[in-house]
Protein backbone atom coordinates (compact mmCIF):
# COMPACT_ATOMS: atom_id res chain seq x y z
CA UNK A 1 0.00 0.00 0.00
CA UNK A 2 1.37 3.38 -0.99
CA UNK A 3 2.01 5.98 1.68
CA UNK A 4 0.71 9.41 0.70
CA UNK A 5 0.81 12.60 2.73
CA UNK A 6 -0.09 16.27 2.37
CA UNK A 7 1.93 18.76 4.45
CA UNK A 8 0.36 22.20 4.91
CA UNK A 9 2.11 25.48 5.69
CA UNK A 10 0.84 28.75 4.24
CA UNK A 11 4.31 30.34 4.42
CA UNK A 12 6.90 27.54 4.28
CA UNK A 13 10.41 28.35 5.51
CA UNK A 14 13.46 26.18 6.01
CA UNK A 15 12.23 24.34 9.14
CA UNK A 16 9.13 23.09 7.39
CA UNK A 17 10.93 22.37 4.13
CA UNK A 18 13.42 20.18 5.99
CA UNK A 19 10.44 18.21 7.32
CA UNK A 20 8.96 17.94 3.82
CA UNK A 21 12.25 16.63 2.44
CA UNK A 22 12.45 14.06 5.24
CA UNK A 23 9.03 12.71 4.23
CA UNK A 24 10.06 12.62 0.58
CA UNK A 25 12.72 10.04 1.47
CA UNK A 26 10.18 7.68 3.04
CA UNK A 27 6.73 8.28 1.52
CA UNK A 28 5.57 7.36 -1.97
CA UNK A 29 3.71 10.62 -2.61
CA UNK A 30 4.44 13.90 -0.83
CA UNK A 31 2.45 17.09 -1.45
CA UNK A 32 3.40 20.48 0.01
CA UNK A 33 0.49 22.93 0.20
CA UNK A 34 1.94 26.42 0.52
CA UNK A 35 1.13 29.99 -0.41
CA UNK A 36 4.84 30.79 -0.49
CA UNK A 37 7.93 28.60 -0.37
CA UNK A 38 11.13 30.23 0.90
CA UNK A 39 14.12 28.01 0.15
CA UNK A 40 17.63 28.58 1.44
CA UNK A 41 20.62 26.43 0.47
CA UNK A 42 18.68 23.15 0.37
CA UNK A 43 16.13 22.90 -2.45
CA UNK A 44 12.95 20.89 -2.23
CA UNK A 45 13.28 17.23 -3.13
CA UNK A 46 12.14 16.87 -6.77
CA UNK A 47 9.78 14.14 -5.63
CA UNK A 48 7.66 16.73 -3.78
CA UNK A 49 4.57 18.14 -5.51
CA UNK A 50 4.00 21.80 -4.62
CA UNK A 51 0.31 22.70 -4.50
CA UNK A 52 -0.21 26.45 -4.37
CA UNK A 53 -2.75 27.77 -1.85
CA UNK A 54 -3.87 31.28 -0.91
CA UNK A 55 -0.82 33.22 0.39
CA UNK A 56 -0.43 34.87 3.78
CA UNK A 57 -1.09 38.63 3.77
CA UNK A 58 0.33 40.55 6.74
CA UNK A 59 -0.47 44.04 5.44
CA UNK A 60 -3.06 44.61 8.20
CA UNK A 61 -4.85 42.68 10.93
CA UNK A 62 -7.98 42.40 8.79
CA UNK A 63 -6.06 41.16 5.73
CA UNK A 64 -4.13 38.72 7.89
CA UNK A 65 -7.30 37.11 9.24
CA UNK A 66 -8.99 37.09 5.85
CA UNK A 67 -5.96 35.37 4.26
CA UNK A 68 -6.21 32.69 6.96
CA UNK A 69 -9.92 32.08 6.33
CA UNK A 70 -9.65 32.05 2.53
CA UNK A 71 -6.65 29.72 2.79
CA UNK A 72 -8.55 27.23 4.97
CA UNK A 73 -11.39 27.11 2.45
CA UNK A 74 -8.78 26.56 -0.27
CA UNK A 75 -7.20 23.68 1.71
CA UNK A 76 -10.59 22.11 2.45
CA UNK A 77 -11.56 22.08 -1.23
CA UNK A 78 -8.26 20.58 -2.38
CA UNK A 79 -8.42 17.83 0.25
CA UNK A 80 -12.03 17.11 -0.67
CA UNK A 81 -11.49 16.94 -4.43
CA UNK A 82 -7.83 16.27 -5.23
CA UNK A 83 -6.10 14.64 -2.24
CA UNK A 84 -8.75 12.33 -0.83
CA UNK A 85 -6.42 9.44 0.10
CA UNK A 86 -3.57 11.34 1.73
CA UNK A 87 -2.57 11.53 5.38
CA UNK A 88 -2.15 15.05 6.79
CA UNK A 89 0.52 17.02 8.62
CA UNK A 90 -0.91 20.46 9.38
CA UNK A 91 1.21 23.32 10.67
CA UNK A 92 -0.21 26.23 12.66
CA UNK A 93 0.10 28.43 9.59
CA UNK A 94 -2.68 29.33 8.94
CA UNK A 95 -3.70 28.89 12.59
CA UNK A 96 -7.35 28.06 11.89
CA UNK A 97 -6.34 25.12 9.67
CA UNK A 98 -4.99 23.07 12.57
CA UNK A 99 -8.33 23.60 14.35
CA UNK A 100 -10.90 23.25 11.57
CA UNK A 101 -9.43 20.74 9.10
CA UNK A 102 -9.26 17.81 11.59
CA UNK A 103 -12.98 18.33 12.25
CA UNK A 104 -13.86 18.22 8.56
CA UNK A 105 -12.09 15.00 7.55
CA UNK A 106 -11.69 11.52 8.95
CA UNK A 107 -8.13 10.60 8.07
CA UNK A 108 -4.73 10.20 9.73
CA UNK A 109 -3.77 13.69 10.90
CA UNK A 110 -0.86 15.13 12.89
CA UNK A 111 -0.21 18.74 13.90
CA UNK A 112 3.07 20.65 13.92
CA UNK A 113 2.40 23.74 16.04
CA UNK A 114 4.84 26.65 15.83
CA UNK A 115 2.32 28.89 17.62
CA UNK A 116 -0.60 28.19 19.95
CA UNK A 117 -3.90 29.89 19.12
CA UNK A 118 -6.10 31.45 20.42
CA UNK A 119 -3.58 31.91 23.26
CA UNK A 120 -1.34 33.92 20.92
CA UNK A 121 -4.17 36.43 20.44
CA UNK A 122 -4.39 36.92 24.21
CA UNK A 123 -0.62 37.34 24.53
CA UNK A 124 -0.63 40.11 21.91
CA UNK A 125 -3.60 41.85 23.53
CA UNK A 126 -5.92 41.27 20.58
CA UNK A 127 -8.58 39.51 22.71
CA UNK A 128 -9.04 38.56 26.36
CA UNK A 129 -9.78 35.13 27.77
CA UNK A 130 -13.42 36.13 28.28
CA UNK A 131 -13.83 37.22 24.67
CA UNK A 132 -16.25 35.00 22.68
CA UNK A 133 -13.59 34.55 19.95
CA UNK A 134 -11.22 33.02 22.50
CA UNK A 135 -13.89 30.80 24.05
CA UNK A 136 -15.22 29.46 20.74
CA UNK A 137 -11.74 28.87 19.31
CA UNK A 138 -10.62 27.10 22.50
CA UNK A 139 -13.69 24.84 22.35
CA UNK A 140 -12.96 23.95 18.72
CA UNK A 141 -9.36 23.18 19.70
CA UNK A 142 -10.53 20.65 22.28
CA UNK A 143 -12.76 18.97 19.70
CA UNK A 144 -10.10 18.95 16.98
CA UNK A 145 -7.13 17.90 19.10
CA UNK A 146 -9.15 14.94 20.40
CA UNK A 147 -9.26 13.60 16.83
CA UNK A 148 -5.62 13.99 15.74
CA UNK A 149 -3.00 11.26 16.15
CA UNK A 150 -0.05 13.36 17.29
CA UNK A 151 0.72 16.96 18.21
CA UNK A 152 4.33 18.12 17.81
CA UNK A 153 5.58 21.45 19.11
CA UNK A 154 8.88 23.24 19.66
CA UNK A 155 9.23 24.01 23.38
CA UNK A 156 8.14 22.75 26.78
CA UNK A 157 6.31 26.03 27.34
CA UNK A 158 4.21 25.52 24.22
CA UNK A 159 3.54 21.90 25.23
CA UNK A 160 2.24 23.09 28.61
CA UNK A 161 -0.10 25.56 26.90
CA UNK A 162 -1.42 22.87 24.53
CA UNK A 163 -2.21 20.53 27.44
CA UNK A 164 -5.33 22.57 28.21
CA UNK A 165 -6.77 21.23 24.96
CA UNK A 166 -5.70 17.58 24.98
CA UNK A 167 -3.93 14.90 27.08
CA UNK A 168 -0.20 15.49 27.44
CA UNK A 169 0.46 11.97 26.11
CA UNK A 170 -0.45 13.21 22.63
CA UNK A 171 2.14 15.98 22.71
CA UNK A 172 5.83 15.65 21.81
CA UNK A 173 8.43 18.42 21.92
CA UNK A 174 10.90 18.52 19.03
CA UNK A 175 13.14 21.62 19.29
CA UNK A 176 13.88 23.76 16.24
CA UNK A 177 17.22 23.50 14.46
CA UNK A 178 19.74 25.41 12.41
CA UNK A 179 19.64 25.87 8.67
CA UNK A 180 23.38 26.48 8.36
CA UNK A 181 26.38 24.16 8.77
CA UNK A 182 28.17 24.27 12.11
CA UNK A 183 31.37 26.25 11.46
CA UNK A 184 33.99 28.02 13.50
CA UNK A 185 33.22 31.66 14.31
CA UNK A 186 36.23 33.04 12.41
CA UNK A 187 36.07 30.63 9.46
CA UNK A 188 35.40 33.19 6.71
CA UNK A 189 36.15 36.55 8.33
CA UNK A 190 38.96 37.69 6.05
CA UNK A 191 37.17 37.48 2.71
CA UNK A 192 33.51 37.74 3.65
CA UNK A 193 31.30 39.18 0.85
CA UNK A 194 28.92 40.77 3.37
CA UNK A 195 31.81 42.49 5.16
CA UNK A 196 33.25 43.72 1.87
CA UNK A 197 29.89 44.95 0.56
CA UNK A 198 29.29 47.21 3.56
CA UNK A 199 32.85 48.25 4.42
CA UNK A 200 32.94 46.40 7.74
CA UNK A 201 36.54 45.21 7.55
CA UNK A 202 38.28 45.06 10.94
CA UNK A 203 35.01 45.80 12.76
CA UNK A 204 33.67 44.00 15.81
CA UNK A 205 30.02 43.56 14.91
CA UNK A 206 26.92 43.34 17.11
CA UNK A 207 24.06 42.38 14.77
CA UNK A 208 20.29 42.05 14.83
CA UNK A 209 18.66 40.60 11.72
CA UNK A 210 14.91 40.24 11.36
CA UNK A 211 11.59 41.99 11.77
CA UNK A 212 11.43 45.60 12.98
CA UNK A 213 7.84 45.09 14.13
CA UNK A 214 6.09 46.91 16.98
CA UNK A 215 6.62 44.23 19.59
CA UNK A 216 10.38 43.91 19.13
CA UNK A 217 12.72 45.68 21.55
CA UNK A 218 15.17 47.33 19.16
CA UNK A 219 15.39 50.92 20.38
CA UNK A 220 17.40 49.81 23.46
CA UNK A 221 20.06 48.43 21.10
CA UNK A 222 20.46 51.87 19.53
CA UNK A 223 20.69 53.39 23.01
CA UNK A 224 23.46 50.94 23.86
CA UNK A 225 25.32 51.95 20.68
CA UNK A 226 25.50 55.46 22.14
CA UNK A 227 27.58 54.07 25.02
CA UNK A 228 30.21 52.72 22.62
CA UNK A 229 31.11 55.92 20.78
CA UNK A 230 34.60 55.61 22.25
CA UNK A 231 35.19 52.20 20.65
CA UNK A 232 35.91 52.94 16.98
CA UNK A 233 36.01 49.27 15.93
CA UNK A 234 32.66 48.26 17.51
CA UNK A 235 29.61 48.66 15.26
CA UNK A 236 25.93 47.87 15.70
CA UNK A 237 24.15 46.57 12.60
CA UNK A 238 20.37 46.17 12.27
CA UNK A 239 19.27 44.21 9.21
CA UNK A 240 15.60 44.10 8.26
CA UNK A 241 12.40 46.00 7.65
CA UNK A 242 9.28 46.88 9.59
CA UNK A 243 7.23 49.41 11.50
CA UNK A 244 10.11 50.66 13.70
CA UNK A 245 12.53 51.36 10.86
CA UNK A 246 11.75 55.08 10.57
CA UNK A 247 11.88 55.52 14.36
CA UNK A 248 15.24 53.75 14.62
CA UNK A 249 16.70 55.65 11.66
CA UNK A 250 15.59 58.95 13.16
CA UNK A 251 17.24 58.19 16.50
CA UNK A 252 20.49 57.10 14.83
CA UNK A 253 20.58 60.28 12.75
CA UNK A 254 19.59 62.67 15.55
CA UNK A 255 22.30 61.29 17.84
CA UNK A 256 24.94 61.18 15.12
CA UNK A 257 25.67 57.50 15.64
CA UNK A 258 28.24 56.58 13.00
CA UNK A 259 28.71 53.24 14.80
CA UNK A 260 25.11 52.12 14.18
CA UNK A 261 23.73 51.22 10.74
CA UNK A 262 20.44 49.95 9.34
CA UNK A 263 20.65 47.64 6.33
CA UNK A 264 17.85 46.13 4.23
CA UNK A 265 17.04 42.44 4.24
CA UNK A 266 19.90 40.62 2.56
CA UNK A 267 19.61 38.29 -0.45
CA UNK A 268 19.69 34.58 0.38
CA UNK A 269 23.22 34.33 -1.08
CA UNK A 270 24.39 36.64 1.73
CA UNK A 271 22.54 34.86 4.54
CA UNK A 272 25.35 32.66 5.82
CA UNK A 273 27.97 35.36 5.18
CA UNK A 274 26.04 37.87 7.30
CA UNK A 275 25.78 35.35 10.13
CA UNK A 276 29.50 34.62 10.03
CA UNK A 277 30.40 38.30 9.82
CA UNK A 278 29.10 39.32 13.22
CA UNK A 279 30.63 38.62 16.63
CA UNK A 280 27.49 38.85 18.76
CA UNK A 281 24.02 37.89 17.56
CA UNK A 282 21.04 39.83 18.95
CA UNK A 283 17.61 38.26 19.47
CA UNK A 284 14.61 40.33 20.53
CA UNK A 285 11.57 38.62 22.05
CA UNK A 286 8.04 39.95 21.76
CA UNK A 287 5.82 39.51 24.81
CA UNK A 288 3.71 36.95 22.94
CA UNK A 289 6.73 34.66 22.52
CA UNK A 290 8.45 35.07 25.87
CA UNK A 291 7.13 31.95 27.58
CA UNK A 292 6.42 29.67 24.66
CA UNK A 293 8.97 29.98 21.86
CA UNK A 294 12.67 30.16 21.07
CA UNK A 295 13.16 32.03 17.76
CA UNK A 296 14.71 29.83 15.07
CA UNK A 297 17.40 32.45 14.39
CA UNK A 298 18.86 31.45 17.78
CA UNK A 299 19.96 28.09 16.39
CA UNK A 300 21.52 29.65 13.29
CA UNK A 301 23.59 31.98 15.47
CA UNK A 302 24.72 29.06 17.62
CA UNK A 303 25.75 27.12 14.51
CA UNK A 304 28.30 29.78 13.59
CA UNK A 305 29.62 29.96 17.15
CA UNK A 306 28.20 33.31 18.26
CA UNK A 307 27.33 34.35 21.79
CA UNK A 308 23.72 35.51 21.91
CA UNK A 309 22.45 38.74 23.40
CA UNK A 310 18.69 38.60 24.04
CA UNK A 311 16.57 41.67 24.74
CA UNK A 312 13.42 40.51 26.50
CA UNK A 313 12.07 38.95 29.66
CA UNK A 314 14.75 37.49 31.92
CA UNK A 315 12.30 34.70 32.83
CA UNK A 316 11.56 33.70 29.21
CA UNK A 317 12.15 30.27 27.68
CA UNK A 318 15.06 31.70 25.69
CA UNK A 319 16.60 33.28 28.81
CA UNK A 320 16.54 29.89 30.54
CA UNK A 321 18.04 28.24 27.46
CA UNK A 322 20.91 30.74 27.22
CA UNK A 323 21.69 30.45 30.93
CA UNK A 324 21.48 26.65 30.98
CA UNK A 325 23.97 26.22 28.14
CA UNK A 326 26.07 29.32 28.93
CA UNK A 327 25.84 30.67 25.40
CA UNK A 328 24.61 34.19 26.07
CA UNK A 329 22.66 36.55 28.29
CA UNK A 330 19.19 38.08 28.47
CA UNK A 331 18.59 41.68 29.54
CA UNK A 332 15.34 43.42 30.34
CA UNK A 333 14.55 46.02 27.62
CA UNK A 334 14.85 48.83 30.18
CA UNK A 335 18.25 47.73 31.52
CA UNK A 336 20.64 49.28 29.01
CA UNK A 337 23.35 49.39 31.66
CA UNK A 338 23.47 45.58 31.88
CA UNK A 339 23.40 45.37 28.09
CA UNK A 340 26.40 47.66 27.87
CA UNK A 341 28.35 45.70 30.48
CA UNK A 342 27.66 42.37 28.75
CA UNK A 343 28.77 43.56 25.31
CA UNK A 344 31.83 45.25 26.80
CA UNK A 345 32.80 42.04 28.62
CA UNK A 346 32.47 40.01 25.42
CA UNK A 347 34.69 42.53 23.64
CA UNK A 348 37.37 42.81 26.35
CA UNK A 349 37.43 39.33 27.92
CA UNK A 350 38.66 37.06 25.13
CA UNK A 351 38.57 33.95 27.32
CA UNK A 352 34.92 34.58 28.27
CA UNK A 353 33.99 35.20 24.64
CA UNK A 354 35.71 32.00 23.53
CA UNK A 355 33.96 29.93 26.21
CA UNK A 356 30.51 31.13 25.11
CA UNK A 357 31.45 30.65 21.46
CA UNK A 358 32.66 27.08 22.06
CA UNK A 359 29.52 26.29 24.06
CA UNK A 360 27.40 27.62 21.17
CA UNK A 361 29.01 25.20 18.74
CA UNK A 362 28.49 22.28 21.12
CA UNK A 363 24.79 23.09 21.54
CA UNK A 364 24.34 23.60 17.78
CA UNK A 365 25.49 20.05 17.06
CA UNK A 366 22.41 18.70 18.86
CA UNK A 367 20.05 21.00 16.92
CA UNK A 368 20.51 19.94 13.31
CA UNK A 369 18.29 18.65 10.55
CA UNK A 370 18.06 15.22 12.17
CA UNK A 371 15.19 16.80 14.14
CA UNK A 372 13.15 16.75 10.93
CA UNK A 373 13.62 12.99 10.88
CA UNK A 374 12.27 12.85 14.44
CA UNK A 375 9.06 14.52 13.25
CA UNK A 376 8.78 12.04 10.37
CA UNK A 377 9.09 9.10 12.75
CA UNK A 378 6.50 10.50 15.16
CA UNK A 379 3.96 11.06 12.37
CA UNK A 380 4.61 7.64 10.82
CA UNK A 381 4.26 5.91 14.20
CA UNK A 382 0.98 7.71 14.85
CA UNK A 383 -0.37 6.56 11.50
CA UNK A 384 0.62 2.94 12.18
CA UNK A 385 -1.00 2.93 15.61
CA UNK A 386 -4.35 4.22 14.39
CA UNK A 387 -6.88 1.40 13.97
Where are these regions (language model features)?
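An aromatic- and histidine-rich active-site surface loop
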Residues: 14, 70-75, 80, 87-120
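Conserved donor-binding/catalytic core segment of Leloir-type glycosyltransferases
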Residues: 195, 199-216, 222-225, 237, ...
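N-terminal subdomain of nucleotide-sugar transferases
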Residues: 1-45, 228, 387
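A short, well-ordered alpha-helix in the C-terminal region of glycosyltransferases
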Residues: 338, 345, 352-366
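Nucleotide-sugar-dependent
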Residues: 216, 267-274, 281-302, 307-320
Amino acid sequence: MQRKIVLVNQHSGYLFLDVVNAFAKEYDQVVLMAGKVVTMDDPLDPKVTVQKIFPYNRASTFKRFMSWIVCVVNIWWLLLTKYRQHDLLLSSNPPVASTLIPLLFRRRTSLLLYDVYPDGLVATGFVGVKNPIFKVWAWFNKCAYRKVDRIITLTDGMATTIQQYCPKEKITVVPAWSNVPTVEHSATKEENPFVEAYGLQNKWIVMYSGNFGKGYHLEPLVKVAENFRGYPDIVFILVGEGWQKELLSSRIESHGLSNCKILPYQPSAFFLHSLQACHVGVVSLTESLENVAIPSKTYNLLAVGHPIFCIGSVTSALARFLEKHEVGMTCDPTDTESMTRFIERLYVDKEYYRRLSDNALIVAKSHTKHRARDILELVAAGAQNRP
